[in-house]
């Protein structure tokens, strides 16, 4: 149940908030929001949220980004 709520929040962000930005800003593939969905789906709410937050903290101008899939 909580997993579905988290994924719904991320999907809401992807559909309504992310398009407001002028250009895509995520430095990674898959995007941080897609990574979060995959992490929560694969590892559950606690570990998935932890992995997603860790990934979001890496998404800044001083990190090179690149291909970073869920392991």
Curated annotation (Swiss-Prot):
Keyword terms: Cell membrane, Membrane
Positions of disulphide bridges: none
Subcellular location: Cell membrane
Highest taxon of source: Bacteria
Membrane topology value: Peripheral membrane protein
GO cellular component, one term: plasma membrane
InterPro entries linked: Membr_insert_effic_factor_YidD
Family of the protein in this entry: Belongs to the UPF0161 family.
Record function comment: Could be involved in insertion of integral membrane proteins into the membrane.
Descriptive protein name: Putative membrane protein insertion efficiency factor
Naturally occurring in which organism (per UniProt): Ruminiclostridium cellulolyticum (strain ATCC 35319 / DSM 5812 / JCM 6584 / H10)
